[in-house]
Amino acid sequence: MSPLKCMALAALGAVMFVGSAQAQTCDWPLWQNYAKRFVQDDGRVLNSSMKPTESSSEGQSYAMFFALVGNDRASFDKLWTWTKANMSGADIGQNLPGWLWGKKADNTWGVIDPNSASDADLWMAYALLEAARVWNAPQYRADAQLLLANVERNLIVRVPGLGKMLLPGPVGYVHAGGLWRFNPSYQVLAQLRRFHKERPNAGWNEVADSNAKMLADTASNPHGLAANWVGYRATSANTGLFVVDPFSDDLGSYDAIRTYMWAGMTAKGDPLAAPMLKSLGGMTRATAASATGYPPEKIHVLTGEVEKNNGYTPMGFSASTVAFFQARGETALAQLQKAKVDDALAKALAPSAPDTAQPIYYDYMLSLFSQGFADQKYRFEQDGTVKLSWEAACAVTR
């Protein structure tokens, strides 16, 4: 074989090796499998509510973020187009996305509950802003601006003695007698920083400060745990205090578990990162004290008492605490949770595994957040922008 031919073959081999390595870096099989299972061809996410045929704004918003992390613009376009057309009546500036869509009582299909869920609203706005930035798509930014302005008009309230705060939705969270209800898991610090960067006069940093105060309140959170819901009662025109939500209880469970994940994913340089991790330290104690070393499914924040359930911990709960324990320097606990998630996903997604063995939506969704972060597919910067691994290593989908 001639020297030139040898050199050509070597060069071809190098190109093939680089191409293979890049494919491994740029592909995200976990997202691709998730999309195959839960996302219809038209961009509608199934199984993200109590009924498998219904869709939630939460499911749509999370899938948009996963598509962004996976550099999957085609799916992102479909997800947002379907959401805007079907959940917002094609007018995101006037209509916040109804949180539940499906078959209505009259057998027609459409929005079942027009009340919005602010966590989904914010995830959509965030995904749109970052998609506009990394894919150079101005229309996404225009849509994000309309959505954020709508949120600011309808969901940001000024609370006596606290400041600006985010309501969970337009209806049902402001009550007579000066009572407000909040959901700690609806507020992701990275998003609030990103919105402040985009709209510096809208009060998003004040919302971030109020959320941190809620988590740090020792009267309503004496054991360093996140509750699903928290109440706030005005005591005068200028004062108030956090209380147990009178419409639920002091339980921390399926909503609250996300609060730990968002805290763990916060950029270390953010001035609220360390205080938030400290405010939630009770999860470390509760997890370490369990027989399995896994987070409790249900825990009462006022007493620290764990509800007995034969030691069951959903896979998604372990997934949600990997970044949290890692950020707190509790690497043994983080590794224990990561091992559980890795093992569960490997078994569920094996080619020989039946479809019924795959994780349910909520566990799978939390695992995508956790595994993507652990694999460094994304990181939140101090200004709230997201750093995506594919930006440097992969072809951008324009």
Swiss-Prot record:
Gene Ontology CC terms, in alphabetical order: extracellular region
Gene3D superfamilies: 1.50.10.10
Reactions performed catalytically: Endohydrolysis of (1->4)-beta-D-glucosidic linkages in cellulose, lichenin and cereal beta-D-glucans
One GO molecular-function entry: cellulase activity
Catalytic residues, chain numbering: 58, 119
Record key words, sorted: Carbohydrate metabolism, Cellulose degradation, Glycosidase, Hydrolase, Polysaccharide degradation, Secreted, Signal
This enzyme's EC code(s): 3.2.1.4
Main location: secreted
Keyword Protein biosynthesis attributed: no
Subcellular location: Secreted
Signal peptide positions (record): 1-23
Superkingdom classification of source: Bacteria
Pathway(s) this gene product operates in, as recorded in its UniProt entry: Glycan metabolism; bacterial cellulose biosynthesis
Enzyme class, UniProt record, top EC level: hydrolase
GO biological process: cellulose catabolic process
Family: Belongs to the glycosyl hydrolase 8 (cellulase D) family.
Functional summary from the UniProt entry: Hydrolyzes carboxymethylcellulose.
NCBIfam families given in the database record: PRK11097.1 (NF008305)
Protein name: Endoglucanase
The species this protein was found in: Pseudomonas fluorescens (strain SBW25)
Taxon lineage: Bacteria, Pseudomonadati, Pseudomonadota, Gammaproteobacteria, Pseudomonadales
Name of the coding gene: bcsZ
